[in-house]
Amino acid sequence: MALMRIRSFVLILPCLALLVLCAGAPPALGDTDLETPQQLFQDLFAAVQDAQIFSDGKSFVDAVPNSAPNLILQEFRAQRPESKEALAQFVAAHFTMPSSAYAAPSPPQQVPLLEHIDRLWDELTRRTPTAPTYSSLLPLPQAYVVPGGRFREIYYWDSYFTMLGLGDAGRSDLIDGMVSDFAYFIDTFAHVPNGARTYYLSRSQPPFFFAMVGLLSPQDPAAAYARFLPELRREHAFWMEGEKDIRAGHAHRRVVALADGSILNRYWDDSDAPRDESYREDTLLARSSGRPPQQLYRDIRAAAESGWDFGSRWFADGHSRATLETTSIVPVDLNSLVYGMELAIRDGCERNGDAACADEFKRHAMQRRAAINRYLWDASGTYFDYRWTQRQRVPRVSAATVYPLFVRLASSRQAHAVAATVRARLLAPGGVVTTPTATGEQWDAPNGWAPVQWITVAGLGNYGESALAQTIACRWLSNVEAVYQRTGKLVEKYDVMDLGKKGGGGEYPAQDGFGWTNGVTRRLLKLYPDPARCARELSALPRS
């Protein structure tokens, strides 16, 4: 019966219709209901992934078993299919394969880009108050927008950028529902998982929940923060778990105590096993890396929590995935977002008349700001990540340097210095490049991503760098339009060095859809509606 409780929201939907979240406790969850496909299917799982029955390992972990996992496993062990063909037949007989989140292209000559984006919202919307029995999918009470392609479930940080466009499209219903879904996750699991799958529960993603909540009441965000204060505080507790007992120079889960006792955060994952969705890639890398496998798996998973999986930011040698050191890094973006979360909690506490809480979180935020300035700010005009295990900054420029501007942490002097760094090191013909380093990884050159563009444009705008912000926006819009004119699609990532091309690299082919690209592009089309200006930006660029 526990399985039925986790898989259905039928009983709680009436109260969700009246309130954003039910006042009572969420449905009871049994531990066995939350086992991942790797845990459920054991040697069958390893055999399927190692044999590469599917070109994308995520296909198998998203498949729905046709009967109880223990019975399927027993039958597998009895039959022991030895050939790849026999194993594929066994899988086909015992599992129902998932479909992709298809986003139909439009003929660009007939459908303008903005109209195409608005057509896609319904195509990418899912409602899963129940999930198939034994599925890895986590059901959610409200409708939500998925990114698209292989990403057929809701994702944490993607959703903030998707919501930007939903708001401009008049889809406040979806924003309200998605915020409620994330609040439900926090109330149920004490954090927002990477995505709505059992195999994502051991990690989160960049904590944008406070920013999503702010979208509910743009003119008075404190009112929304007050409404969701329990969830904001619970998520903060998740990221800060262990801070009170940690000694200087040590780390525990997501908190790091630096040499002077300052507390900052890192990315982490509670599992040190290969990822379910990328099992084969992880085990092959471990075999060739010469590193203890569990240590490498933890750093792989922590990079997945960062959302930047993968890129040179996390590589000890700057170019090889085998040298991943994510858990040794105190990142600029994460600590900026936790600072923003702390200010949001302060504002919510003030609105609720809780002065002690407001003072506490103001103090947390000010201490974090001081530590960021002490450890991450560099006189060259850049915020760098910090390698806490060696007490040194990592002197590599990345678009993460703009996050302190996004949450208004930087001073005016720092912000204008960062703007100069963006102009000199990151500005490209098609927008902002993620890093200037070309490694073949998807979070490096020549790729640009929608979230990077928005964080940069919004951050620069916070400090009066409007001309540079508009240049970036126009270049991004021109690039998105060029790909749309050629393909009729919006995609996950773009080549910002060579206009009109999709981005490449990574563990899987470029995906269409695409939630956060749609959201950011639609918001930028509203903020910068002058096509003539963007045309001038494009015409001034050198042709390859």
Question: Predicted segments — roles?
Answer:
Residues 12-23:
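Bacterial N-terminal signal peptides
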Residues 21-31:
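Bacterial Sec-dependent signal peptides at the C-terminal "C-region" and cleavage site
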Residues 40, 47-153, 177-192, 196, ...:
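Extended glycan-interaction surfaces of carbohydrate-active proteins
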Residues 155-185, 400-411, 453-466:
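Alpha-helical support elements that line or immediately flank enzyme active sites
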Residues 186-228, 511:
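Aromatic/His-enriched, Gly/Pro-containing loop or helix-boundary segments
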Residues 216-227, 345-360, 463:
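Inter-helical turn/loop segments and adjacent helix faces that build the functional surface
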Residues 327-352, 446-454, 459-463, 467:
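Long, repeat-rich segments with strong aromatic
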